[in-house]
């Protein structure tokens, strides 16, 4: 970092690290936000930071970057407000040119997808492939390991109900330090949390199961079905982050409790007709 001309980053750089005057830091962020960020958060249950401490971190980051890559007008508006860029006179730092990483979603071939499935060990399946990619929770943290996550899916129930029709690729958020043991569900649940390229998982899957993650914006480019399993919706909306979008506007069915029967119904609907 000390000798490079450009810094390309998709998260906030540590508060104590600053670019030199002749270095250019390009903030690419890591997705279009559904959940509120930075200065836009008004309710905040976080294990490590107060709301003022978080806003300070965004303020420090705003002082560092010269450019901020945005995929859309919607995202630009949210980035400007979340980093309070107008107050710092930096709203013109936004470059609204889309995410280069999404080009792969449009340029892939059947051979590319077959190669990905082979790498994942699912090349011979004729079942629907469901990518389950939940986000992390600000208020779930263990000081000994970091952020934790407890899956609120009854995989026993799902396997009995749709195991003959579907397999699940489970991708935990990179901040989550929890270890997951899916040995009991071998052949039904595949832990792909350590697989580096999430775009490959988008391409290999037939549908997305997520909650508040920004992955759905990128996945929408593929026009594949999506299910939003927001089992802790009330707490997330009222205590943790809240949202930029009314969930009724999301491009797929929304489940706002732990209703496994409803989740199974939506998975079966995908298996039967692939409705989007």
Predicted regions, residues:
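Donor nucleotide-activated moiety binding/catalytic core segment of transferases
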Residues: 1, 169, 174-217
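Conserved catalytic-core segment of nucleotide-activated headgroup transferases in glycan assembly
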Residues: 99-182, 257, 271
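A donor-sugar binding/catalytic signature common to diverse glycosyltransferases
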Residues: 7-36, 195-240
């Amino acid at each position: 970092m000390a000798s490079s001309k450009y810094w390309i980053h998709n998260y906030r750089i540590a508060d104590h690290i600053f670019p030199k005057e002749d270095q250019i830091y390009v903030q690419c962020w890591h997705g279009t936000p559904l959940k509120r960020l930075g200065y836009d958060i008004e309710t905040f249950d976080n294990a490590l930071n107060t709301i003022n401490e978080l806003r300070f971190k965004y303020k420090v980051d705003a002082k560092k970057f010269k450019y901020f890559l945005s995929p859309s007008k919607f995202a630009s508006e949210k980035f400007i407000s979340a980093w309070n860029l107008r107050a710092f006179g930096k709203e013109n730092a936004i470059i609204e040119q889309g995410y280069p990483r999404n080009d792969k979603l449009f340029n892939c071939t059947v051979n590319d997808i077959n190669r990905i499935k082979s790498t994942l060990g699912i090349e011979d399946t004729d079942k629907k492939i469901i990518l389950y990619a939940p986000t992390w929770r600000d208020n779930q943290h263990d000081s000994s390991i970091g952020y934790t996550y407890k899956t609120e899916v009854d995989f026993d129930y799902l396997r009995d109900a749709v195991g003959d029709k579907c397999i699940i690729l489970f991708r935990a958020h990179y901040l989550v330090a929890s270890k997951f043991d899916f040995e009991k569900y071998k052949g039904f649940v595949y832990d792909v949390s350590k697989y580096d390229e999430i775009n490959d998982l988008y391409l290999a899957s037939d549908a997305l199961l997520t909650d508040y993650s920004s992955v759905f914006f990128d996945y929408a480019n593929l026009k594949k079905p999506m299910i939003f399993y927001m089992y802790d919706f009330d707490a997330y909306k009222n205590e943790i982050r809240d949202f930029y979008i009314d969930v009724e506007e999301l491009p797929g069915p929304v489940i706002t409790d732990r209703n496994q029967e409803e989740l199974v119904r939506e998975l079966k609907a995908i298996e039967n007709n692939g409705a989007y």
